[in-house]
């Protein structure tokens, strides 16, 4: 289904999601391809707000975390779900007694129950599911085989499987192990909003400075989804707030694109440069105006005014 709207300035700002195409008014000669989520504030638990392109005539394309996002969007975390039985139930893992670490819900797995990042209960999407039957009639209790050993350390991090992740890291020392795209367990956890996993990995030696093959960072991935708690943890570790990857974006540009106001403010207060431009020549303010994100625009304007006042003083 395609929808188009003529622009007042003779150009189009096109937002594409899967086969759907939307047309919005915006800046001249800009084409943006990305999953449409204009009302997002804190990052969706089910989607990935990345994968955008800024296209201008005779300009370089900007693909935000393209390879990683493509694998997540097209396969819908296929690498994780292919190894999980469709009948598995979400259950609790009493891991607090051993590690005193809380897990958060896993957006990368589809189960019968819907959870959000705000859920605080312990869980394990791959824990054995138990079917209770009437023993008086001769029926026995049936269980589903446990598949944790078949999951990679990256999949465990993305799902928030704290118990199995901690055991795997202790046994194999793979806390900074990279996948085929150069992504670490920390990057996967940051991209999926797994706050407790990110905290656990950082406390146990995960390197937040490591980059993917396209120079993607854990901070950029977290900013693209608006996970403010994770963004704060990474900033507290001293990561480069202005890390510019080969896809043409910085953490601030990703946060602006996702309309994540709190992340934008946090990044600016931590020294993010609002004047850095994409490969297409647009800075964070240009992008906020083009996408119609007024709240983000106001945050950037307020920050720029403070900078000007400090210069005058």
UniProtKB/Swiss-Prot annotation:
One of its GO terms (molecular function) is low-density lipoprotein particle receptor binding. The keyword Ribosomal protein does not apply. It is a peripheral membrane protein. GO terms for cellular component: cytoskeleton; cytosol; membrane; nucleus; protein-containing complex. Changing residue 254 to A: Decreased affinity for HDAC4. Changing residue 188 to A: Loss of interaction with CCDC8. Decreased affinity for HDAC4. Signal peptide: none annotated. It comes from the Eukaryota. PROSITE patterns: ANK_REP_REGION, ANK_REPEAT. InterPro entries: Ankyrin_rpt (IPR002110), Ankyrin_rpt-contain_sf (IPR036770). GO terms for biological process: regulation of gene expression; regulation of protein-containing complex assembly. Pfam families: Ank (PF00023), Ank_2 (PF12796). The keyword Transmembrane helix does not apply. Transmembrane segments: none annotated. Keywords: ANK repeat, Cytoplasm, Cytoskeleton, Membrane, Repeat. SMART domains: ANK (SM00248). ANK repeats lie at residues 148-180, 181-213, 214-246, 247-279, 280-313. It is found in: Cytoplasm, Cytoskeleton; Membrane. May regulate the interaction between the 3M complex and the histone deacetylases HDAC4 and HDAC5. May also regulate LRP2/megalin. PANTHER family: ANKYRIN REPEAT FAMILY A (PTHR24124), ANKYRIN REPEAT FAMILY A PROTEIN 2 (PTHR24124:SF3). Interacts (via ANK repeats) with CCDC8 (via PxLPxI/L motif); mediates the interaction with the 3M complex which is composed of CCDC8, CUL7 and OBSL1. Interacts (via ANK repeats) with HDAC4 (via PxLPxI/L motif). Interacts (via ANK repeats) with HDAC5 (via PxLPxI/L motif). Interacts (via ANK repeats) with LRP2/megalin (via PxLPxI/L motif). Interacts (via ANK repeats) with RFX7 (via PxLPxI/L motif). Interacts with AHRR. Interacts with NEK6. The ankyrin repeats, mainly ANK 2, ANK 3 and ANK 4, mediate interaction with a wide array of PxLPxI/L motif-containing proteins including HDAC4 and LRP2. The PxLPxI/L motif of interactors can contain a Ser or a Thr residue in position 2, which phosphorylation prevents the interaction with ANKRA2. This is Ankyrin repeat family A protein 2. It comes from Homo sapiens (Human).
